[in-house]
Amino acid sequence: WRDWMIGYESSHIEYVDPDGEIERGPLENSYQQQYQKRYYAKIKDWERGIERELEDLTTVMLTFSASNKNDLGGWRCPADHMRDIADGYQTAYSTLWNVLDGYEWDFAKVWEPHQSGYGHMHLAVAVEDPAGSISAEMFRPVMRSYVENTKPAGSEAHGLTTPGMGDAVSVNDDVGDLGCYIAEYVGMFGEEALERSISTQLFYATCWATGTRRVEFSGRAQDRIAREQFRRETGLRPEDRGGSTFDQWRGDESGGESGESGESGDESGSWAVDSICTVSGGSPTYSDPTAGGQRLTRIDGREGVDPPAHRD
């Protein structure tokens, strides 16, 4: 991971602009400070969006974790530990849909590093709750589903032995400092990634090796973020002019990022990725942008080498 990060210091990406000219800029990744600032802007846009659009807002924070020891008493492989949590979350998410059936809600999923170097997951949920009926106990089936389908996840750590769900589920009747909490979880403020503690870098390396995004927004949350960005950039409301201006703006934004052509079917007005290069001493060395990526492979027999510990 460190070698990969260091490689970004001299890496650039080249685009073909709408006039056919080559434009070059630094290649970025989500662990760099400038990228973190965009993450934070999105988080704050989501916070503003739910506060603006949900009149009777309730926020819920659910925390999913797992033991970092294996069944042999040793340390669990960090990648397997992260996958344990991610796989268990998928079953919990299905239960969450049932629990919140009939409500308008959206969420942000966030991974936070622990001082041990392992990670755990927070799910920040924003719910329109006009009757004030949302309580922590409503989410007991969600946490039970997670524990039952995640062998190294304990009942006590997920509030199942505690009335009110303990620290595993927290409910607030406003947005509060939700954006700041999420930013703190992700570690958006502070030192550059390669200057952080070894435990934090271990967590980053695990996210990188498993292809895990540290922050993800639901589709509805992404829509709110886009509307807030539109307000900020244009000074208009998304519903102005029947929403057509917002739709056009969003289409232009999407096309500009992806390099897709517009409605006319030609390439005019679009940007396209041309190549990736390393610049050293002023002379670029080019690479095929389609040749990279991660290749994930299961190791035969790994269950016997690193079996997850069972927690009641």
Give the location of each predicted region:
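Right-hand nucleic-acid polymerase module
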Residues: W1-G117, D129-D312
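Short hydrophobic/aromatic beta-strand micro-patches
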Residues: A124-E128
